[in-house]
Amino acid sequence: MKSIYKYTFMLFVFLFGTLMMAEDITGEIVVFHAGSLSVPFAQIEKAFESQYPGTDVIREAAGSREAVRKVTDLGREADVIGSADYTVIENLMIPEYTEWYINFANNEMVIMYTEDSRYKDEINSDNWYEILLRPDVEYGHSDPNADPCGYRSQIVWKLAEKYYKVDSLYKKLADNCPPKNVRPKETDLIALLEAGELDYIFIYKSVALQHRMPYVELPEQINLKSTKYADFYATASFDVTGKEPGEMITQIGQPMVYALTIPNNAPNLQGAIAFIKFVIGPQGRAIMEENGQPSINPPEGVNIEKAPQELQDFLKGGAND
C-alpha cells in the first residue's frame, strides 16, 4: 500500500512540475525558417502549442539566407532561426547576431517531377542531365543568393560534370536554365511544377516525400547526403553574396546539415529555448522522421558553451529522453 501512495505522490509531483513549466512558457515565439522545414515545423508548432497552451508560434518560411537577412539586414526580431545549412548561420550571423548553433537534421538533393512532366518514363539517375538538356524540357532551381537549395543545385551540377565525365556539363545546365525558372526558395518552384510550367526541379528529398511527388534519386557521389563522399563534394563550390555589398562567400560542397540558433536579441528567450528543446527532443525528431527528414541523433552543438545554460544541459543529457 505504501508503494502505491509513493508512486501516486511521485506522479503528482511530475505532473505538477510539468504543468508549472508549461505555464512559465508563454507568449509569441517567432520562428524564421527554411522553406523545406515548413511541413514538419507546422506539425511541430501544433504539438508544441498543445504542450505549452500559453504560447503562439509564429512561423515565417523563406530561403535560409533570406530568413537570416531579415534579422541581420532588416533589423527584424526573431526568437528562433531554422536554417537548411549551418554555414548560413556561420557566415551571416556569427559573431554579431549569435555565437552558437545546433545541428539537428540532414537531407539530400533529388530531381522532382509530375506525372505530366516530359520524358518522365525515361529519366533516371544515369541519364537525367541528357533529359534536362533536351530543347523542349523546362527545369528550375531556387535562387542561390537566397536559398541553400539554390547553391546546392549548382554544386550538384558541378559534381555531375566530374562524376559522369561530361565536358562543360555545368555550363550547359546553367545556360539552359533561364532566370524565369529560378525562384527565391525551393518550395516556390512546386507551384510552377504543378502548373506545368516546369518539368523538373532540383529540391530536397524531404520536400518531395512530403508532397507525395515522384522524384529521381541522384547518386550518393553527387546528392550531398553522404559523409562517405565529403571529400569529393568539397571539390565543387559556388560563390554567393556575403554580409557586405560586393562581398562574396564561397560555398563548398559538403553533406547537408540543418541548424537552429537563437538570435542575441530574441524577445522571448525562454520560449525560444523551449521550442528548440522540443524540436531536437524525441517528439520533434519523430515528426522530422515522419516527414522524410533524418534527424541528427544526438544533435550536435557548435560553440554550445555560449548557448543558454538550459540548452547546454539538455544536450548533455535530455535530448535523448
Curated annotation (Swiss-Prot):
Residues 1-22 form the signal peptide. The keyword Transcription does not apply. GO terms for molecular function: molybdate ion binding; tungstate binding. InterPro entries: ABC_trnspt_W-bd_WtpA, ModA/WtpA. One of its GO terms (biological process) is molybdate ion transport. Keywords: Signal. The keyword Signal applies. Belongs to the bacterial solute-binding protein 1 family. WtpA subfamily. This is Uncharacterized solute-binding protein Pmob_0379. It comes from Petrotoga mobilis (strain DSM 10674 / SJ95).
